[in-house]
Amino acid sequence: MSEKNKLAEKLLYAPKNGYDRLSAEDEKAMEAYCEDYKKFLNNGKTERLCVEYCIELAEKKGFKAYEAGMKLSAGDKVYFNNRGKGIMLAVIGSEDLSHGANIGAAHTDSPRLDLKPRPLYEEAEMAYFKTHHYGGIRKYQWVTIPLELHGVVVLHDGSKVDVHIGGKEDDPQFIINDLLPHLGREQGKKPLNEAIPSESLNVLLGGKPFEDKDCSDRFKLGVLQYLNAQYGITEEDFISAELEVVPAGKARDIGFDRSFIASYGHDDRVCAYAELAGIFDAVSPKKTAVCIFADKEEIGSEGVSGMLSQAFEWFMGDMCRTQGVALSDCFANSFCLSADVTAAYDPNFADVYDKRNSAFVNYGVALCKYTGSGGKGGASDASAEVVGKVRKLMNDNGVFWQMAEMGKTDAGG
């Protein structure tokens, strides 16, 4: 090797495609991991379903439900179910919590359509649900695609029923109508974010009337008759329901080489599953390992199941109390990775990316030093020390990684 090449290899940063670095054994392990990830996506279409599936997997790995004041020893595995919408898991370390914990945090809620409190109506002899979109959806992506309905309904007597329609092969599914091209001239002149108004995101439910020709609202009543027979639901019960409309279908491999996965919910279940797999592999950690599945990130992390609640502090604080440790001491010595998705460079939309500071497909996990928009507005900006620690950790353990921002400074954030 020439002196020039030696110097270039020593001084220049030259990321490489992961496929050029993977051994055959590593590639086989990666493919097995992706198959398990697809199962997670298929079983976790909503934040509630993610929690249920997480508990199912965790209990198979020896995790037990955490109870207040529970005495824990090194190696114990516990989970705390936060109202069925969030979950935290911990593997107790050999050091007490005064030395802190290593924490991974991701969210399992994804953009979707929620039903309004009084959603059911009929118009032009068809039955519909009114929706209120949750999080930052691209509205045009939600019309004319098959949809599923998942959630819970608390009935008038206080009992709760689970509703899951559209996920099984023989289930009916739902759809939101759009204009046909022949009548869409004026719609086509509108900006993309205005062409499909939020109030037009009405889910088509059916067009078969109730048998009695003399009753009013025959089509609405036909839907209620079905829901009452299957679930015991009346119209008033929608007021105390959490019903979510999500895209139908299972995760699928994409490409002749099956090198991509298409699915609803990558944001942020791709990170949630990674940290879950990580804590399942944690064996006799020195510091306690903690995994967080948070809810409500898409709308600001509010509410009792979001990260702005006291749920995480309660879980950590209660474990600290059993060890006689102050929660503040634990947090002062803890380390946390907040895991969420970013945007990989897409040549079809190259104008919104800073190519030199973008993530690229197959170049490894994307690390983002800061978030925010514009001039780092609202950013969480990691220090050089934190980035250096994570960078060294990745390199020392053979993890493929890359640094990334989300697009050009003025493009969004």
Regions found by a protein language model. Name each.
Residues 1-413:
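N-terminal hydrophobic/helix-forming segments and targeting peptides
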